[in-house]
């Protein structure tokens, strides 16, 4: 999915507002995903998935850091996320549908924390951005 210049501006502005809360939002989105889509828990059998778990917080930070990297390299996400794509495709073997589920939960989390900034245009841009990230992460599944 091609991001327009306006989309890139919206994504950078929205992610900039996330700032120091990125890890917390990542963890919240993961918790939301585990509650809303319980089958996603199968990829984390070794995690304590309870609310506020240090393991969920740690993985939420990894998710947020990867998205921060993608925002910083929005014009070259395939190279920026190459190692992460390899990891999810070849070692973790995460079903690609789960990226869509987490993307949805991230959008809900961002909208809940930043309702004034979460305009329809920003929502659409973030949705396109997360779809692009998902596409990159699943590109090595073939």
UniProtKB/Swiss-Prot annotation:
Red blood cells. Keywords: Heme, Iron, Metal-binding, Oxygen transport, Transport. One of its GO terms (biological process) is hydrogen peroxide catabolic process. Residues 2-142 form the Globin domain. Pfam families: Globin (PF00042). O2 binds at residue 59. InterPro entries: Globin, Globin-like_sf, Globin/Proto, Hemoglobin_a-typ, Hemoglobin_oxygen_transport, Hemoglobin_pi. Heme b binds at residue 88. One of its GO terms (molecular function) is iron ion binding. One of its GO terms (cellular component) is haptoglobin-hemoglobin complex. Belongs to the globin family. Involved in oxygen transport from the lung to the various peripheral tissues. Heterotetramer of two alpha chains and two beta chains. This is Hemoglobin subunit alpha-1. It comes from Hylobates lar. The lineage of its organism: Eukaryota, Metazoa, Chordata, Craniata, Vertebrata. The gene is HBA1.
